[in-house]
């Protein structure tokens, strides 16, 4: 009999890659989604797997809907990849971040404990937990210093997952995920702003407007990270693992690499990037796009995951950029 997995956040970047990977491994995959939220299946549609997902109503604010979803699907594994807000956006509705990203995980764990404590549970934690980290790179033992309501809520979720594991002997674990991108990344993230923006710029559209070009990120590929999630949940013992590349590049360097891939000769004049052939503006900046509270340098040490789980990455930064650029060129070739 096939294993069953409930993926909460199945319509997101990580959820679609995880669902695809699980389906390829023979799993029966259930996708948890809020009933009154407009369905956003574009990622699953683009991957061609929408019809293979069995959708169930699940709202992390509603304990009863969580219980109903778990009772209906009877999963062997539950992956919580849902998040209401990211980073500084959580300042707009801090209470909702708390109720969804923090207390929502408590509701999940309590439902699993009551219905079937043998269900394995994976919680997607975030490198934002480290905030202004006091050591670089960060390991599983680096102290946390969250810098936003989102990060505070995720820290509660991280700790309550460990608490339930220790108190009730549940197989519950967290993956501390550093930045990971893909063609399925949302358009408000800087990497997609760049790859989509350049695809449109090639079609005669406006220059790309960015924030701080010197911000450094540890960027990996979501496809690699969802494999790490599955390895974490299938380890001999439940533990926390960092998933990261261990390397950072700046936003400016990401732009440069993308331009190089597209064979666009360019030069920088301060924070403006122009086409060498005709001096046409490609990229500019606006202070309005700068984050009000920048975290410290976040770069993860995934030695533990590599050593204990055998986790390895298929994509380097150039492979990630190539994958994202080709996808956006296909999408916007007729724009």
Which residues does each PLM region occupy?
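N-terminal Rossmann-like NAD(P)+-binding domain of SDR-like oxidoreductases, especially those catalyzing
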Residues: 1-180, 223, 233, 296, ...
């Amino acid at each position: 009999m096939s294993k069953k997995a409930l993926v909460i956040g199945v319509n997101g970047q990580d959820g679609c890659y995880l669902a695809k990977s699980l389906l390829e491994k023979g799993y029966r995959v259930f996708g948890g989604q809020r009933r009154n939220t407009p369905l956003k299946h574009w990622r699953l549609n683009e991957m061609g797997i929408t019809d293979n997902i069995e959708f169930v109503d699940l709202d992390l604010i509603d304990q009863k809907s969580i219980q109903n979803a778990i009772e209906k699907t009877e999963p062997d594994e539950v992956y919580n990849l849902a998040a209401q807000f990211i980073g500084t956006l959580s300042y707009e509705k801090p209470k909702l971040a708390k109720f969804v990203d923090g207390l929502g995980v408590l509701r999940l764990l309590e439902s699993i404990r009551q219905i079937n404590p043998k269900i394995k549970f994976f919680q997607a934690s975030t490198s934002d937990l480290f905030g202004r980290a006091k050591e670089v790179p960060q390991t599983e033992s680096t102290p946390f210093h969250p810098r936003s309501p989102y990060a505070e809520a995720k820290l509660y979720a991280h700790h309550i997952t460990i608490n339930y594991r220790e108190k009730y002997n549940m197989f519950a674990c967290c993956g501390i995920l550093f930045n990971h991108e893909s063609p399925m990344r949302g358009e408000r993230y800087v990497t997609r702003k760049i790859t989509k923006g350049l695809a449109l710029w090639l079609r005669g559209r406006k220059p790309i407007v960015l924030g701080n070009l010197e911000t450094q990120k540890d960027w990996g590929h979501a496809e690699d990270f969802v494999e790490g999630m599955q390895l974490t949940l299938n380890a001999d013992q439940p533990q926390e693992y960092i998933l990261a590349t261990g390397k950072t590049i700046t936003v400016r360097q990401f732009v440069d690499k993308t331009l190089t891939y597209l064979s666009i000769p360019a030069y920088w004049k301060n924070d403006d990037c122009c086409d060498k052939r005709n001096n046409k503006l490609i990229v500019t900046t606006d202070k309005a796009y700068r984050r009000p509270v920048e975290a410290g340098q976040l770069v993860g040490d995934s030695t533990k995951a590599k050593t204990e789980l055998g986790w390895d990455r298929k994509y380097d930064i150039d492979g990630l950029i190539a994958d994202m650029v080709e996808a956006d060129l296909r999408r916007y070739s007729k724009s």
